[in-house]
Amino acid sequence: MAIFAEAETWVAIAFVILMGIFAYLGVHRTVLKALDNRRDRIKAELDEARKLKDEAAKLLADYRARRAQAEREAEAIVASAKADAERIAAESKAKLEDFVVRRTKTAESKIALAEAQALADVRAAAAEAAVSAAAIVLSQSVKGQVADDLLGKGIQEVRSKLN
């Protein structure tokens, strides 16, 4: 009976008895049930994680599509604004050039009018001077009624020719 003197034998006997008690009490069913529950919970968590991952992927794709659309719209707006700015600049330049041309024509016409007026004033002053000189010369050289008649006719004739 040396076999019963060994500690390992008693550990093995105790283990077999303990397993028998566990089998009698149905502990193995409880352990299996707990493992099954844990497996189901892990599977549900994995399914939920997979579903969340799919939703996140869809949201990411949607976000990228919206961002791309927004970038295209922004580029279109910028292009439209540039085109509008160029068009407005061209219109403004054309209007400014037209304004300068009109102002130049107005200034030229005013200058021409002033030149014509100055020329007319000079001619009138020259005519007055000629008439006055002729009147003085005639009055000093001719005397009497004949002188007055000649003087009047001469002044009238000079005025009509010079004006």
UniProtKB/Swiss-Prot annotation:
Give the multimer and partner information: F-type ATPases have 2 components, F(1) - the catalytic core - and F(0) - the membrane proton channel. F(1) has five subunits: alpha(3), beta(3), gamma(1), delta(1), epsilon(1). F(0) has three main subunits: a(1), b(2) and c(10-14). The alpha and beta chains form an alternating ring which encloses part of the gamma chain. F(1) is attached to F(0) by a central stalk formed by the gamma and epsilon chains, while a peripheral stalk is formed by the delta and b chains.
Summarize the protein's role.
F(1)F(0) ATP synthase produces ATP from ADP in the presence of a proton or sodium gradient. F-type ATPases consist of two structural domains, F(1) containing the extramembraneous catalytic core and F(0) containing the membrane proton channel, linked together by a central stalk and a peripheral stalk. During catalysis, ATP synthesis in the catalytic domain of F(1) is coupled via a rotary mechanism of the central stalk subunits to proton translocation.
Specify the superkingdom.
Bacteria
Q: Does the keyword Transmembrane apply?
A: yes
Q: Which gene encodes it?
A: atpF1
Q: Which PANTHER family match?
A: ATP SYNTHASE SUBUNIT B (PTHR33445:SF1), ATP SYNTHASE SUBUNIT B', CHLOROPLASTIC (PTHR33445)
Cite the entry's keywords alphabetically. Answer: ATP synthesis, Cell inner membrane, Cell membrane, CF(0), Hydrogen ion transport, Ion transport, Membrane, Transmembrane, Transmembrane helix, Transport
Recorded GO molecular functions are: proton-transporting ATP synthase activity, rotational mechanism; proton-transporting ATPase activity, rotational mechanism
User: Under which name does UniProt file this protein?
Assistant: ATP synthase subunit b 1
Q: Which residues cross the membrane?
A: 7-27
Determine if Phosphoprotein is one of this entry's keywords: no
Family membership noted in the UniProt record: Belongs to the ATPase B chain family.
Q: How does it sit in the membrane?
A: Single-pass membrane protein
- Which GO CC terms are listed, alphabetically? plasma membrane; proton-transporting ATP synthase complex
Q: Where in the cell is it found?
A: Cell inner membrane
Q: What organism is the protein native to?
A: Rhodopseudomonas palustris (strain HaA2)
Q: Which InterPro entries match?
A: ATP_synth_b/b'su_bac/chlpt, ATP_synthase_B_chain
